[in-house]
């Protein structure tokens, strides 16, 4: 991977030699350090916590401001290669996501390869950085939703849909890791490193404390149910989303995450208060779309088979 970054820096130097001297100088300086001692350069970049003085990050931002598709592609390749090495500090993630959003300010005019690269980077960020939560997570996912909804290129919109399926699963799987970290706490020293609560979910039985990843899943599931019911989301800045697609996302969640619902009553409450009502509504009137009706029926079958013990009354209502 370090060798790959050196090659990408060389390509960026060559591409910016004539038109973009600021980017070229930054790339040349970083390349010289990299060739002299790659391990030391990686260590120094990893230890730099100030985004404004992070050499690689600032070079990438400069390159993305050129509006040259080739230069931007090379910069995003560098960004993608740096993520598994965690060269970028956690404090830089907001800058990274803001930069990607800037590139999509006019999706129809953004280079296709740049759009595809952005989708890959978002997935890599979610897998690598545990603290992509809350607003950062919302903004990261919106990059994918924007390309899914607005890209005019079929390969981009289909890739965005695939990445969204994958990324939603990653968000839910992070809750399992968070739960396991609490299960592993056996002494005060371990408790010090445990995540701090970020909010509560108000349930009829009383409030439930939410930790970062659990809060993300709670808000995301709420949003998916709202969008399936034709209502605007709150965690995600989305007013609408293709109903067949949002039902597909819900089906993926319910198919693979039943054990998570058993441990988290706030998620079961969403099934009761949001999922079952919109399914009852969808099945009680003539279907506007055959694909929506079929997907709604599949969700009902899933609830009957996998969640009947958690939502007994709601299941009875669905069977009437």
Regions found by a protein language model. Name each.
Residues 87, 143-152, 166-174, 186-193, ...:
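Eukaryote-specific, cytoplasm-facing alpha-helical/coiled-coil scaffolding segments in long proteins
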Residues 98-157, 162-163, 167:
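Extended alpha-helical scaffolding segments
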Residues 1-24, 29, 132, 142, ...:
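Eukaryotic intrinsically disordered, low-complexity segments enriched for acidic and Ser/Thr/Pro residues
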Residues 59-63, 99-106, 146-148, 227, ...:
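Alpha-solenoid HEAT/Armadillo-like helical repeat scaffolds in large eukaryotic proteins
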Residues 18, 65-67, 106-110, 147-151, ...:
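Short coil turns that connect the paired helices of HEAT/ARM alpha-solenoid repeats
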């Amino acid at each position: 991977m370090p060798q790959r970054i050196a090659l990408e820096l060389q390509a960026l130097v060559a591409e910016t030699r004539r038109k973009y001297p600021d980017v070229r100088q930054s790339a040349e300086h970083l390349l010289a350090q990299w060739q002299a001692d790659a391990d030391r350069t990686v260590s120094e970049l990893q230890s730099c916590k100030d985004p404004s003085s992070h050499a690689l990050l600032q070079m990438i931002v400069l390159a993305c401001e050129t509006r040259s598709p080739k230069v931007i592609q090379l910069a995003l390749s560098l960004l993608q290669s740096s993520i598994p090495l965690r060269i970028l500090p956690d404090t830089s993630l907001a800058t990274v996501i803001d930069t990607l959003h800037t590139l999509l300010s006019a999706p129809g005019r953004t280079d296709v390869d740049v759009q595809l690269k952005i989708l890959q980077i978002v997935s890599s960020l979610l897998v690598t950085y545990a603290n992509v939560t809350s607003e950062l997570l919302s903004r990261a996912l919106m990059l994918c939703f924007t390309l899914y909804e607005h890209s005019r290129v079929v390969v981009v919109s289909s890739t965005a849909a695939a990445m969204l399926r994958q990324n939603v699963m990653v968000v839910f799987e992070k809750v399992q890791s968070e739960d396991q970290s609490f299960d592993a706490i056996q002494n005060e020293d371990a408790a010090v490193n445990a995540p701090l609560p970020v909010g509560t979910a108000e349930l009829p039985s009383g409030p439930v404390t939410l930790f970062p990843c659990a809060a993300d899943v709670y808000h995301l599931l709420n949003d998916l149910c709202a969008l399936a019911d034709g209502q605007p989301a709150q965690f995600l800045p989305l007013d609408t989303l293709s109903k067949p697609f949002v039902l597909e996302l819900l089906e993926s969640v319910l198919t693979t995450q039943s054990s998570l619902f058993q441990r988290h009553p706030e998620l079961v409450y969403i099934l009761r208060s949001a999922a079952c009502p919109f399914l009852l509504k969808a099945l009680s009137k003539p279907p506007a779309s055959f694909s929506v009706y079929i997907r709604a029926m599949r969700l009902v079958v899933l609830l009957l088979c996998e969640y009947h013990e958690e939502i007994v009354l709601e299941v009875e209502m669905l069977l009437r």
